[in-house]
Swiss-Prot record:
Residues 16-36 have a biased composition (Acidic residues). It is found in: Cytoplasm. This is Cell division protein SepF. Homodimer. Interacts with FtsZ. Keywords: Cell cycle, Cell division, Cytoplasm, Septation. Belongs to the SepF family. GO terms for biological process: division septum assembly; FtsZ-dependent cytokinesis. Pfam families: SepF. Cell division protein that is part of the divisome complex and is recruited early to the Z-ring. Probably stimulates Z-ring formation, perhaps through the cross-linking of FtsZ protofilaments. Its function overlaps with FtsA. Residues 13-58 are annotated as: Disordered. It comes from Lachnospira eligens (strain ATCC 27750 / DSM 3376 / VPI C15-48 / C15-B4).
Length: 183
């Protein structure tokens, strides 16, 4: 067996070999001291941390976090109607039953020009009373243009100027320069 002993001695494959005596157990403590730079997928799932978080941020907290809500604002946004979308409706009621149409139009945010010409005075008075009540209830505005024509507006429409003065021609047009082209 000389040749087989020579080969095993050469490869040190026999039992009396102490080849691992000089080897120290470096990997025995490896798992205890090792900190993973990237959290595992399971840890990220339950802690909510992303892959880019640092190791210091990865500490797991078992206390429940308080939900984060934006502070309640005391300002409530209001839908405003642009001047382009403003609509004026001319209504000429014939009976008291038509007064409901005035209120419905105001509730949609549209202004109403109420023409009561040609109606019996008592019915016209009842329609004005009804319209004044509904205008007051929605905090709108009711203005007399002439004896039989009224302007009824919802709260989102402001009326400026003196309407009867404008209708009767009470504005002095001489203050406008006709030679100057402003537009």
């Amino acid at each position: 067996m000389g040749m087989l002993d020579g080969l095993t001695n050469m490869f040190k494959m026999h039992d009396d070999d102490d080849f691992d005596d000089d080897y120290e157990d470096y990997d025995d403590d490896f798992d205890e001291d090792y900190e993973d730079d990237k959290p595992s997928a399971r840890k990220r799932l339950f802690t909510g941390s992303s892959k880019k978080d640092s190791v210091a941020d990865e500490e797991v907290s078992y206390t429940a976090e308080k939900p984060r809500f934006a502070s309640k604002s005391k300002v409530v946004p209001m839908k405003t109607q642009s001047a382009r979308g403003l609509e004026v409706v001319v209504i000429r009621p014939e009976s008291m039953e038509d007064a409901k149409e005035i209120t419905d139009t105001l509730l949609t945010g549209k202004a109403v020009v109420l023409n009561l010409e040609g109606i019996h005075v008592e019915i016209a008075q009842r329609i004005i009373d009804y319209s004044a009540g509904s205008t007051y209830a929605i905090r709108g505005n009711l203005q007399k243009i002439t004896n039989y024509i009224f302007l009824v507006t919802p709260p989102n429409v402001d009326i400026s100027g003196d309407i009867p003065e404008i209708v009767t021609g009470g504005i002095d047009l001489s203050s406008f320069n006709k030679n100057e082209n402003r537009f």
